[in-house]
């Protein structure tokens, strides 16, 4: 059940996300920790992007989203390295990473995100002094996890929740680069307008659905944790 995109379920007339806001619980204990933390306004954001020939729109995504936050930091390509990342993670409300991602089924703790100089693994994330309430992993397969005894998720989600995040936006499969840019623009515009995370993601998905009806394009991302 962990891999079912409930927001993309279709009843023959509509997809579930068209009629309701949907968020996913990471597990009772983790969710309790997420909901216990006081809410903060999303004022300071860190946008990190590493592009290449397979994901050429990452630069546009990173720079466009950063302009929505007057108090933001952008690390793009060469500056998006592990050292620079660790300088800023303790003093932000939002962390957005746009890059390549990979899930390691044989060892989920080595699932990772591609920075400019190295892969950022789950073990690395555990050691970050992360102060961001919202973490968006705009990459492939960032929401895929292995289910351990006790319904514990082993993967990137576990790392970022352990590091202190309250809400994660993750992906279930390989995402379409250009469509992801448009979805993220709409998502952050809705947040900036005061919408809840669940409402913002729903609006973004419905907007993409109008242009690209197939669920492959609009439904890979889902919200986990506080909504």
Per-region residue spans from a language model:
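Catalytic cores of enzymes
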Residues: 1-227
């Amino acid at each position: 059940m962990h891999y079912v995109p409930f927001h993309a379920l279709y009843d023959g007339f509509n997809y579930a996300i068209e009629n309701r806001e949907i968020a996913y619980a990471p597990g009772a204990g983790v969710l309790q920790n997420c909901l216990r933390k006081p809410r903060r306004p999303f004022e300071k954001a860190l946008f990190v992007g590493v592009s290449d020939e397979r994901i050429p729109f990452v630069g546009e995504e990173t720079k466009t989203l950063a302009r929505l936050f007057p108090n933001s930091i952008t690390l793009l390509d060469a500056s998006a390295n592990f050292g620079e990342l660790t300088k800023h993670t303790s003093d932000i409300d939002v962390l957005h990473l746009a890059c390549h991602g990979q899930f390691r089924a044989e060892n989920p703790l080595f699932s990772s995100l591609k920075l400019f100089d190295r892969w950022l693994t789950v073990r690395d994330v555990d050691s970050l002094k992360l102060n961001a309430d919202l973490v968006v992993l705009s990459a492939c397969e960032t929401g895929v996890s292995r289910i351990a005894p006790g319904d514990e998720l082993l993967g990137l989600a576990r790392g970022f929740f352990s590091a202190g995040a309250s809400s994660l936006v993750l992906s279930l499969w390989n995402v379409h680069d250009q469509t992801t840019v448009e979805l993220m623009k709409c998502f952050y515009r809705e947040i900036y307008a005061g919408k809840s995370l669940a409402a913002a993601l729903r609006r973004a998905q419905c907007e993409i659905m109008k242009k690209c009806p197939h669920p492959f394009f609009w439904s890979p991302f889902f919200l986990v944790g506080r909504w």
